[in-house]
Amino acid sequence: MLGALQIETRRVGKNLTMEAETTPPSAELKSLWNHQKEMSERLTDKAALISTKELHRAVMLVMADRLKATIDRDADLMYHSCEDYIADLKVVQRSLAEANAKRSAYGPLQDLIWQAETFGFHMVEMEFRQHSVVHSRALEDIREHGLHGERGELQPMTHEVLDTFRALGSIQKRNGIKAARRYIISFTKSAQNIRDVYELNRLAFSHPKDVPTIDVIPLFEQLEDLQNSVDVLEEMIKIPEVQARLKATGGKMEVMLGYSDSSKDAGPTSATLALHSAQERIAKWAESHDIDLTLFHGRGGAVGRGGGPANRAVLAQPVGSVKCRFKLTEQGEVIFARYGNPALAIRHVESVAAATLLQSAPSVEKRNTDMTAKYADMANKLDEAAHNRFLDLLNTDGFAPWFSTVTPLTEIGLLPIGSRPAKRGLGAKSLDDLRTIPWIFSWAQARINLAAWYGLGTACEQFGDLNTLRQAYEEWPLFSTFI
């Protein structure tokens, strides 16, 4: 990314050929030029030789050379943050605008500023993710044996956890905080899970930090966790490190919701309704605390993992949960289908972006709120019936061995696909220990799409009012999207 910015900065700068007589540089630009000269007369002399009387161009050429120094890790000349680079670009832009060269100020130069603001020096942000139990076990290991193994050898997993935080810190040091600042906790159960991560981050560097530079993101996955999410968040914002991050980010907070495990845990119908309810409650909670919330949707590609048309899913979100922002995972099995062709990729992104803007319109928010209230009783009845039916299946005697027999579960577990093992722990014996991907894929390979619908038919049949179901399908986006 730095190389691309360097090339573009030089290209934009070379086109700023206006002389000082026709486009007088501002005092702010002259001050920036003097600062560059103090930093390196070699660079300013080279730029001045090329750009006699063209100060806007000369400043941009020095900026391009400083980006090259950033790539080379030249501590004396490098930009230490993308924000400093953007600030210099805006000095040039303001100078051009004040000189009435607005086409130059808001043309390719503006595009360059947008690129830098969007991608930074790192282009793509790296996110880290680990199971909450791994953190708690690592802390137990450290308390028992000492941080440096004073009382016995630490477990390999503990070393891996500490090394992960050190790697995160190294990435931030080299590429800026925004390059790697999000740490997701799978299976968040309580606020203690968040405390564990900040404690491990502190221990990894063997010294306390004044203000932490990572945002810990709780991931609520199972039905009970979704139901308790607001209580956990209420305790979470009392943690000093979380308060420090909220202050540092201007009140921004991210919360992730898991579609896959909630579906496996409660069945597709109950999971859909529980996720919708959780989003609604979390959005209201965030608003009450003046928190700028982003909900991160951990949707899979398969319908049983929350998959389906993303634009329709956006339009079905509850009021206050989008606010012109929609973050979601794109699973490996759908990446080629959505992004393998440039035309399809553009169409998909435009479709989701349009839905995100439309969902934030007052009329759409009001419709979703009204329809959720109108069909709340129906939803509760469908939820109870579908959940009971799904649990009846899972609790049927002999279901687990039958599932292993009629589907290629064992073989899928051996495939070198995915970023995590098929089961949680080497001794996993039950369906509870089975990860969602092999659960979904095993059904799919047996040509049984059970994970996407099981329990819904029974729930609709027990509800009995076909006219109400049809009306809900026409009026309530959540219900029609699910169907």
Task: Report the location of each language-model feature.
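Active-site cores of enzymes that catalyze phosphoryl transfer or operate on phosphate-rich substrates
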Residues: S51-T52, V59, T118-E199, L203-H207, ...
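Catalytic or ion-translocation cores adjacent to nucleophile or general acid/base/metal-coordination motifs
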Residues: L2-L16, E21, A204-L382
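Generic, well-ordered alpha-helical scaffold segments in large soluble proteins
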Residues: A4, E8, N15, V91-S95, ...
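Acidic, glycine-enriched catalytic cores built around paired aspartates
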Residues: H122, E127-R129, V134-S136, G146-E153, ...
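Short, surface-exposed connector motifs at secondary-structure boundaries
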Residues: R94, N175-R182, T213-D215, D292
